[in-house]
């Protein structure tokens, strides 16, 4: 008993210390995060393990877990990286309603030792709830007698969001009668009223439909609408009104009882009983009117009641009253004058004989169609009959004898306009009132083939994707023939012609009856971009008539050609290239360039390059240009970098779907001392010819400048002597200038002209030499310019064709077809206007010309101003005036001669993998270097010969 009492305080003290320690741990582990509501699953909330000071490796052994009393499934922790993320949808309005603060409280528990951390995740409100009105339509009833400034309260909208997202503003559709009075507050609407602006008129507008819109203050704002239907109640403020104040009618004396004399109609714009009208004779009423006529109080019809007698009373004057049924009735009045007419009781008779129907539409005018006779049993003026015909018809009546008429064609017929005529012959006697009789004649018009089939438009444009299945329907032509029956039966056929070396019928066919055009074989955009032909439509008339329509079928390109890597040069195998580079290079050093071409066009041939990082790792110090294919370093290399790198370059076009190709680049890192040896051997064969080429160009430029200076001095001396010399006998006149030579490089150009002088007296012929004209077009090459005869000025403006012995190098041809040059490349297309040739522009994606690769020479039919420097596929960046390109070619330079004299089996390195590092020289390049030196000597000799010719 004593021992248990002595050991009691110690466990209590231990328990107390544990509670204090747990409370201290709990307080020190409080974390706060925030996340927007409606965040997607996996949204990052915070690095909870790092913030709690826990290592990632101890999360699993220490049983790291998250618990929540009410919302345990909203947030979760990834035990691999210690990140707290959104596990399920979080709706702030569902969690906290309209509370200003909304948080999710979590408890993080770890064992060994036991630790408890409190985490508070604040849920931020987003504008995800639009304003909502209690109802989508609200009806309001307003009497038209309500005065202006009357207010009609409205129910405001509510927004489940908080703060600015729930601040509502209202707007009403513009109108002339109502305006909106709204007092805004940040949280809710205090009052919302509809105010009447001016007096209403139900007779003008019976119902107003307005749209009330509520907008919250979120970004972007959300809106809610309610349609206000305002019905105007009627007030009896309008009296019935007749259309006329006085009506005049006539009635025959032999009219039967109940004969309608007139139907009076009064209108009241009021509604309901206020607009119901009762008709009556206005008092006092004469006994004669009461005896002869009666009035219907509901519809205003006045009918005969007793027998009328023209000899006893010829005219009745009746006063009629119209009264509405409003609480305070209002009345309208009019006067009716009824005239009684004498009777002509015998009508004429009409007889039609000798019809010639139907008639052809090509019948000539004045042809007789029918004979008509009329008669009337009355005598005097009541028996005198006149005939008339339906107006506005191509027929007329011609009186041939007393009471006899002929129906004659008056003008040309057109069955396509009117196929039949319903003629009405009216015979009227001379009685008072006159009696008449009518007879109908149906005249049919027979068709004549006078209309050719007509298409809706003279030309149709059709777009067909390439690789279509054979026999697919691409278009339907339809021609309409205004004729009838066989004359309108249309058949279709192709207008045969040759398309290249093949007949048109081998490409397309047309169905004779339906006009459907079919493609007989798959079309290829790369071979045929436009197919233009004609379809003929003919009717079945005698003789047949026809017309043609032109179809322009454009073959649309599809992405059916994958990018193709250009064949690598020596030292490469397949799509793989090896390269040595020193470790001492800095960031941005270009190592190698990958090139590819795509046979498609447009976006289908626009190529982009990217490294496949998954194959080589994510920390390589290299990157590739998206559109250039240049592989360069991203940072300086250090010792920890691997000595060998294998890069996979993915070449992808922009078609749908995109097609790809893969190139492999093997890079080996060497020390700085080893790089120059490999570099000197690798660049000896490639740089040497280019350096020699630049030296020769410099010499040529110096020589040309010296010769030009000498010519200028000679010209000045000649002019001075000419001016000081006495005039020669005879008359001399300048002849037409002849262009000797003109050349351009970049924005600099020079030219020469000869102007022979034609003299009529004694003295030698002289020639004026004009040099360095900056605005003349280029002439032909030096071999053709010296022996050319004098031409007219018009001949100088004609474009020159390129020399047949000039051609592009392999790299330049590849650049012309690369992704960057798709729109700038010169492509020969056989279009409607004939083939035209464009030369490619120089872009940043094309490297500077290597040995044996030059720009097109001046005089080869190319305007040097069209060679512009471009940076990527965007807008061209033109060189400024007075700027010279880094390298340009002078006509007759060794570069051109080397190209013209290059043998067919030349093994000059034209690798399309252009490397900028330094690699070892192979045995083939050593042999090639010796051959190039011999070739350069020959080219220098040829260059001297060409310069002397110029």
Curated annotation (Swiss-Prot):
Pfam families: Cadherin (PF00028), Cadherin_2 (PF08266), Cadherin_tail (PF15974). GO terms for molecular function: calcium ion binding. Residues 719-950 are cytoplasmic. The chain crosses the membrane at residues 698-718. It is found in: Cell membrane. InterPro entries: Cadherin-like_dom, Cadherin-like_sf, Cadherin_CBD, Cadherin_CS, Cadherin_N, Protocadherin/Cadherin-CA. Residues 787-800, 909-923 have a biased composition (Basic and acidic residues). It is a single-pass type I membrane protein. Keywords: Calcium, Cell adhesion, Cell membrane, Glycoprotein, Membrane, Repeat, Signal, Transmembrane, Transmembrane helix. Residues 1-29 form the signal peptide. GO terms for cellular component: plasma membrane. Glycans are attached at residues 257, 265, 548. Residues 734-894 are annotated as: 6 X 4 AA repeats of P-X-X-P. Residues 30-697 are extracellular. It comes from the Eukaryota. Residues 774-808, 827-950 are annotated as: Disordered. SMART domains: CA. Potential calcium-dependent cell-adhesion protein. May be involved in the establishment and maintenance of specific neuronal connections in the brain. This is Protocadherin alpha-13. It comes from Pan troglodytes (Chimpanzee). The gene is PCDHA13.
């Amino acid at each position: 008993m004593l021992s248990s009492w002595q050991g009691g305080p110690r466990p209590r003290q231990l328990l107390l210390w544990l509670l204090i320690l747990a409370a201290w741990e709990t307080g020190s582990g409080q974390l706060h995060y925030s996340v927007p509501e409606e965040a997607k699953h996996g949204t990052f909330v915070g690095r909870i393990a790092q913030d709690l000071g826990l290592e990632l490796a101890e999360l699993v052994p220490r049983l790291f877990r998250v618990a929540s009393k009410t919302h345990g499934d909203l947030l979760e922790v990834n035990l691999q990286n210690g990140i707290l993320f959104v596990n399920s949808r979080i709706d702030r309005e569902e969690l906290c309603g309209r509370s200003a603060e909304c948080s999710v409280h979590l408890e993080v528990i770890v064992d060994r030792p036991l630790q408890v951390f409190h985490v508070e995740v604040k849920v931020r409100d987003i504008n995800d709830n639009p304003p909502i009105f209690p109802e989508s339509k609200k009806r309001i009833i307003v009497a038209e007698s309500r005065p202006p400034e009357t207010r009609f309260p409205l129910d405001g909208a509510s927004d489940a969001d908080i703060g600015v997202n729930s601040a509502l503003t209202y707007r009403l559709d513009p109108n002339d009668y109502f305006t909106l009075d709204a007092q805004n507050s940040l949280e809710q609407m205090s009052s919302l009223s509809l105010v009447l602006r001016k007096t209403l008129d139900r007779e003008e507008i019976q119902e107003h439909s307005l749209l009330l819109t509520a907008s919250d203050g979120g970004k972007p704002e959300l809106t809610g609408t309610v349609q206000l239907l305002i019905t105007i109640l009627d007030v009896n403020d309008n009296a019935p009104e007749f259309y006329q104040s006085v009506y005049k009618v006539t009635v025959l004396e032999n009219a039967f009882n109940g004969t309608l004399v007139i139907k009076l109609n009064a209108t009241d714009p009021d509604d309901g009983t206020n607009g119901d009208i009762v008709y009556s004779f206005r008092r006092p009423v004469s006994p004669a009117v009461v005896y002869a006529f009666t009035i219907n109080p509901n519809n205003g019809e006045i009918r005969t009641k007793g027998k009328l007698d023209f000899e006893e009373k010829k005219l009745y004057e009746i006063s009629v009253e119209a009264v509405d049924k409003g609480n305070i009735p209002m009345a309208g009045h009019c006067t009716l004058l009824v005239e009684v007419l004498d009777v002509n009781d015998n009508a004429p008779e009409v007889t039609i004989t000798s019809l010639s129907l139907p008639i052809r539409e090509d019948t000539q005018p004045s042809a007789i169609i029918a004979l008509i006779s009329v008669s009337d049993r009355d005598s005097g003026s009541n028996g005198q009959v006149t005939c008339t015909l339906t107006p506005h018809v191509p027929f007329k009546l011609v009186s041939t004898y007393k009471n006899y008429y002929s129906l004659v064609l008056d003008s040309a017929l057109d069955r396509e306009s009117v196929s039949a005529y319903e003629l009405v012959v009216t015979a009227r006697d001379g009685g008072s009132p006159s009696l008449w009789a009518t007879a109908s004649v149906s005249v049919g018009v027979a068709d004549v083939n006078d209309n050719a089939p007509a298409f809706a438009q003279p030309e149709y444009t059709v777009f067909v994707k390439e690789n279509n299945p054979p026999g697919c329907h691409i278009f339907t032509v339809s021609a309409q023939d205004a004729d009838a029956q066989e004359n309108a039966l249309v058949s279709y056929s192709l207008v045969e012609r040759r398309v290249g070396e093949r007949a048109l019928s081998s490409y397309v066919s047309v169905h004779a009856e339906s006009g459907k055009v079919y493609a007989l074989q798959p079309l290829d955009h790369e071979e045929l971009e436009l197919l233009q032909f004609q379809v003929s439509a003919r009717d079945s008339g005698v003789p047949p008539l026809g017309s043609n329509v032109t179809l322009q079928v454009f073959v649309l390109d599809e992405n059916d050609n994958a990018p193709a890597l250009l064949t690598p040069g020596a030292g490469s195998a397949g799509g793989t290239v090896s390269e040595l580079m020193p470790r001492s290079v800095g960031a941005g050093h270009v190592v190698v360039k990958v090139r590819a071409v795509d046979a498609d066009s447009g976006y289908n041939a626009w190529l982009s390059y990217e490294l496949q990082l998954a194959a080589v790792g994510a920390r390589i110090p290299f990157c590739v240009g998206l559109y250039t294919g240049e592989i360069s370093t991203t940072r300086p290399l250090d010792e920890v970098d691997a000595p060998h790198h294998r890069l996979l370059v993915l070449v992808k076009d922009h078609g749908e779907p995109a097609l790809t190709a893969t190139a492999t680049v093997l890079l080996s890192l060497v020390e700085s001392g080893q790089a120059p040896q490999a570099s000197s051997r690798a660049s000896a064969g490639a740089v040497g010819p280019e350096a020699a080429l630049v030296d020769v160009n410099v010499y040529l430029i110096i020589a040309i400048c010296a010769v030009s200076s000498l010519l200028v001095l000679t010209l000045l001396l000649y002019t001075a002597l000419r001016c000081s010399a006495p005039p020669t006998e005879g008359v001399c006149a300048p002849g037409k200038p002849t262009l000797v030579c003109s050349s351009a490089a970049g924005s600099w150009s020079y030219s020469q002209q000869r102007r022979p002088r034609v003299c009529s007296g004694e003295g030698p012929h002289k020639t004026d030499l004009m040099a360095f004209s900056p605005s003349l077009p280029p002439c032909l090459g030096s071999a053709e310019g010296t022996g050319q005869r004098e031409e007219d000025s018009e001949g100088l403006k004609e474009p020159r064709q390129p020399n047949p012995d000039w051609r592009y190098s392999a790299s330049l041809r590849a650049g012309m077809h690369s992704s960057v040059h798709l729109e700038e490349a010169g492509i020969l297309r056989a279009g409607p206007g004939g083939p035209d040739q464009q030369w490619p522009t120089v872009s940043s994606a094309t490297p500077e010309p290597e040995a044996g690769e030059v720009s097109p020479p001046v005089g080869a039919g190319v305007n040097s101003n069209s060679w512009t420097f471009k940076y990527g596929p965007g807008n061209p960046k033109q060189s400024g005036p007075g700027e010279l390109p880094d390298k340009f070619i002078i006509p007759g330079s060794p570069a051109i001669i080397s190209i013209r004299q290059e043998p067919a089996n030349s093994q000059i390195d034209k690798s399309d993998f252009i490397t900028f590092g330094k690699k070892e020289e192979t045995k083939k390049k050593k042999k090639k270097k010796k051959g190039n030196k011999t070739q350069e000597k020959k080219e220098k000799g040829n260059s001297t010969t060409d310069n002397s010719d110029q």
